[in-house]
């Protein structure tokens, strides 16, 4: 797509505007940016690319390249914030722990952490989308569900059952690792 802002789609213009606002105004994004800076991994708005996507994804982290926001899948500013936070947690993990993204356990751990800490499993969001089946330990169930879906997308994953087993295997240690946060609410 052309880099001339005049030729950008309405979705691209909105994505660019929202991403720039979040990078300078969102407390969680600013906190994660600072944590990444401490790892000598500087990220600016220009390192987050707005692109149209075909899949059901709202974004992605590409090791060594940066973050992609799916301009045609972001419907609210909060959704964009959750997506950027999720991908920044992957970036943090990649730089802090040298994640091997082909290793399903490594990916599952990062997905668990990102789903738990990004806000995408907030109770209010889950309620709005009809995903609340029980109030007890719902956050954990949401994190497991979302991590399983992501691991299933890895070409090295053979089945949903394998993804579920791997997520379950690493869940406790990864779910209880809040770095760079002290805790989650």
Swiss-Prot record:
Task: Write out the catalytic residues in the record.
Answer: 87
Q: Which cellular compartments is it found in? A: Mitochondrion inner membrane
InterPro entries in the record, alphabetically? Peptidase_M76_ATP23
Q: Where does a divalent metal cation bind?
A: 86, 90
Point out the coiled-coil segments of this chain: none
| Keywords annotated in UniProt | Hydrolase, Membrane, Metal-binding, Metalloprotease, Mitochondrion, Mitochondrion inner membrane, Protease
Query: Looking at the UniProt record for this protein, which Gene Ontology cellular component terms does it annotate, in alphabetical order?
Result: mitochondrial inner membrane
Family indicated by similarity: Belongs to the peptidase M76 family.
PANTHER family hit by this protein: MITOCHONDRIAL INNER MEMBRANE PROTEASE, MITOCHONDRIAL INNER MEMBRANE PROTEASE ATP23 HOMOLOG
This molecule's function is given as:
Has a dual role in the assembly of mitochondrial ATPase. Acts as a protease that removes N-terminal residues of mitochondrial ATPase CF(0) subunit 6 at the intermembrane space side. Also involved in the correct assembly of the membrane-embedded ATPase CF(0) particle, probably mediating association of subunit 6 with the subunit 9 ring.
Question: Under which name does UniProt file this protein?
Answer: Mitochondrial inner membrane protease atp23
Task: Identify the taxonomic lineage of the organism of origin.
Answer: Eukaryota, Fungi, Dikarya, Ascomycota, Taphrinomycotina
Name of encoding gene? atp23
